[in-house]
Amino acid sequence: MTTSILDTYPQICSPNALPGTPGNLTKEQEEALLQFRSILLEKNYKERLDDSTLLRFLRARKFDINASVEMFVETERWREEYGANTIIEDYENNKEAEDKERIKLAKMYPQYYHHVDKDGRPLYFEELGGINLKKMYKITTEKQMLRNLVKEYELFATYRVPACSRRAGYLIETSCTVLDLKGISLSNAYHVLSYIKDVADISQNYYPERMGKFYIIHSPFGFSTMFKMVKPFLDPVTVSKIFILGSSYKKELLKQIPIENLPVKYGGTSVLHNPNDKFYYSDIGPWRDPRYIGPEGEIPNIFGKFTVTS
């Protein structure tokens, strides 16, 4: 993201944010940030050197400068190899075909943004429980699903973060996710855990400190035990942000999500204005509000005419 766009939204986090975030640094952390940037400049890196990005890497490595440099260098290598630097442009060049697949997939595997949580973070829902993997993999592949994830991370940083930060009046860096496993079979749960691990690998290795809260609701009996098998492969910081809930989740969700922003099906009061609209086509938030859209422009409309914007 260019410096000019960074200048159009807050670059300081809320005073209540965690230590080590922009605006909440100790003298030692400030010195580590300067040294980290200096090393990267010496290595001829020129992109993604803003305070917010560098501090996310430093926090992920507990302000160990050498480990943070190693992580940043590996991420830049991966970005080039995977195509993350051009993934939005590639999508725009193949928008019609990708959107057709995404619209079909949305009915089988609803994934949507719907307003913000109490901290002003984008609120993201995934309804993974009712999917039929055999049918879904006739439309897409796990590889493509992970590529869609990377594309969403890039869209998140480019469009959702700036708009949410302008609305909140302070820097928003993370999201709040609700993963609904209602109806999932235990056999499918193994595949789900494998997918969650792949998602977590990409998240914690290449997009550090983007996860704010991650709620897994309607988790079936035995899921927590299965999760313990995956936990050793996840960063402890990532694990601390994951909350596995059963069917009694409403009270916990409402601690973090305004009742007016939580869909009725999850115990809130939020409904779509047009009864013919579907939540899996929803994309409601500051990133669609002209008051908060800056020089980055409006986020691409993946669902075309289906997208709910108010």
Curated annotation (Swiss-Prot):
Entry-linked InterPro entries: CRAL-TRIO_dom (IPR001251), CRAL-TRIO_dom_sf (IPR036865), CRAL/TRIO_N_dom (IPR011074), CRAL/TRIO_N_dom_sf (IPR036273), PI/PC_transfer (IPR051026)
UniProt xrefs under Gene3D superfamilies: CRAL-TRIO lipid binding domain, N-terminal domain of phosphatidylinositol transfer protein sec14p
Pfam families the record matches: CRAL_TRIO, CRAL_TRIO_N
Disulphide bridges, residue numbers: none
GO molecular function: phosphatidylcholine binding; phosphatidylinositol binding; phosphatidylinositol transfer activity
GO BP of this protein: post-Golgi vesicle-mediated transport
Domain CRAL-TRIO residue range list: 101-274
Cellular component, GO annotation: nucleus
More info: Present with 2870 molecules/cell in log phase SD medium.
Designated name of the protein: CRAL-TRIO domain-containing protein YKL091C
Taxonomic lineage from the root: Eukaryota, Fungi, Dikarya, Ascomycota, Saccharomycotina
